[in-house]
Amino acid sequence: MATQPSENTPKVITEKKIFLPTEKKINLFNIIDRFNNHLKKLKEKLQEAHFQKQANKLTSKEQELKDNDDGKSKSKNENDSTSPEKKDVLTGTGVALPGLIQLAGGFTVSITGNAGTAQLGGRSSRNGNQRQSISRRIIIRSENQRTQNLTESVESVHTSQKKNEVRQALMISAIKKATHGTGVNQKKPEEAVRINAEASRKIKPEVNYNLKIFLAEKTLTSKEKKEAAKLIKKINHEISEWLTKFFTTRTGRQRELQKNLIWSLIKKFLPKVIGLERSGNHVHAYFMLSKLYGLLRMACLKVISQKKTILSRRNKMPKERIRVKDEIIRLEKEIKHLTNPAEIGLKEKQLLGQKEELDSLNAEDVLFQGFEIKLTPTESQFWDEACLTEKQEISRQLHYDNWEDYKKNLTETKTQKRIYHNILSKLITLGTKKENKNLLEEHFVFFVTKGNFYIRAFLEIQFAHLFGAARRGENEPEDSSVQGTNSHLNLVYLETFSHSISCLYEMGGYIANVELTTGAILKLLSQSLDSLLLSSSNSSVDERNSYVKTKASLQSLKQLLLEYCNFHNDPESFDVNTTQELKQRLKDLSSVSLSKKKELELYKELLKAFKLCFQDIMNALSEVLKKLEKRIPEKTFTELKELFLLHQSHLIKLKQVCGALSSLFGFFLIELKSLWQLPLDEYIGVFIGSEPRKK
């Protein structure tokens, strides 16, 4: 990643939000402080909402309490006053504070004696109605499980609104004094009041990221503010839902500990997500968010594991066992869509540290440079335990008993893949319509954000299938119509690479996006394809001769592509005729009649050649990008746009190359569909007939 510019970077640079790694540094400490403040407010809201619910429950019992509880509370107060260990719960100290506290509306609170009795008085109504006396107990458990009874005598008028105001004021006062004082709950104030499961199910904690972090910035345009607000709303909703579901699965001290751990981890991840998104690093922000969601998912899986352990104990009562079973079923349903093998993405496998499968696919070096998360020992232990639970769950989910089960799972994701393609086609349509209307300026944010997300989502599904096939390969029947695990692996790479080429073809005009996206894709594909080529099977002399001829033809093709892609030296020397010649050569190669085995070797070599070509393309693009980066801090947006236009002809040439490669893969997909009878209908339409767009 490029180094951050100084604080003196002209504000006019970011007015139109060109997402290159030259944005002004974000002060993460201020964001963390704001987030901490919101956490405190959130805790208070939870407590107030819980006690408001308790107050509402008392409404139906007011008449009974009026007649019966006065005498009981009086005798109880006398007993309490004789105990030297009892302390005033309202103040949190052992000292009585006799006197009156004046409240709004003319009400007074009198505090008398060490028993902690609070009496509330109010004016009578104007029509002369008599006052009603209401008394209520709030039980607060201390550290050593001693119980203190706080008896409150509340006198109020008939008006329900005033009664509720008095009740709420007294309860808030009591809880604040009890949890923040110097009394029995000094060491563990969070245990003073426990929010029961019923209350927390109805309370959805909202993680407010403070929209001012985004929207108060004068450097943002209105369109960018709208995009940022959408992102914040989505994150708020999803994390809110997960935290609510997670918190309702724990009781007592254990729940408090786990909740605090999760909050501490969220606080470490969140500022980086906000800072990355604000500075335009959408891919980094997306993966950082996926780590956060992965953490919450792991926590839920850990809860399931714990509950299954509880269920295995024989000394549980039948009702308790039924309750635990219901909770397990509910949790498993909630995370089913996240633990589906078709959706287990590469990002989550990286979290699990499955080195045996990911050493050759270490994309994290590309995607997380300079964004380390430092965890405390306690947080690290919690993370490791959750990762272990997650790893076991994924191992179970990815293991198929036979090939038919795997094929069934493969076809189930057909609809999902079509959804991704539909979204991409909408992006392509939008780009086509707006291309002559300042696309760079108006839709840069939209393309970069959405494009990266869906390219990554599709790639992750493909790699999940790849890992599933590798796990299941030894169980494949010999007479299967599918030509072996290696064939399927190559098919997955073919689909993945052709899809990424198609996306890059449509989005190739945006230098920052292409540089970042293709860098990650090439990192994954190059290392993986190398390992596949090393494992190619032995062949006969005739096959080897044919293979050598094919390789020679591919070398010629590669040379033509390299000459074509060398646009930064002499872009004017290439014309439409060159493009037509290139496409014809590709068609000639694809029409060669080969056996299935030779076909396999052919497109292995094709992929290798295209991989090398794309590396050369990226080297050329990187040089262009470096030239731009040197000039960005010194130029206004208008001048910057002129720089992009200077390189537009180069980028159109790149689009044409990508379009030609995409067409070739389309021809191969037709052949593979007939050979291996796999569901490829949704792919072929994307890659066939994609003529390069003209300038």
UniProtKB/Swiss-Prot annotation:
What keywords would UniProt list here?
Chloroplast, Plastid
Q: Does the keyword Chloroplast apply?
A: yes
Bias class Basic and acidic residues marks the residues at: 59-89
| A GO CC term assigned to this protein in UniProt | chloroplast
Q: Region (Disordered): which ranges?
A: 53-90, 117-137
Annotated compartments: Plastid, Chloroplast
Q: Where is the composition biased (Polar residues)?
A: 117-129
Q: Which domain of life is it from?
A: Eukaryota
The question of whether Chloroplast is a record keyword is answered with yes
* Name of protein: Uncharacterized 79.7 kDa protein in psaB-ycf62 intergenic region
Organism of origin is: Chlorella vulgaris
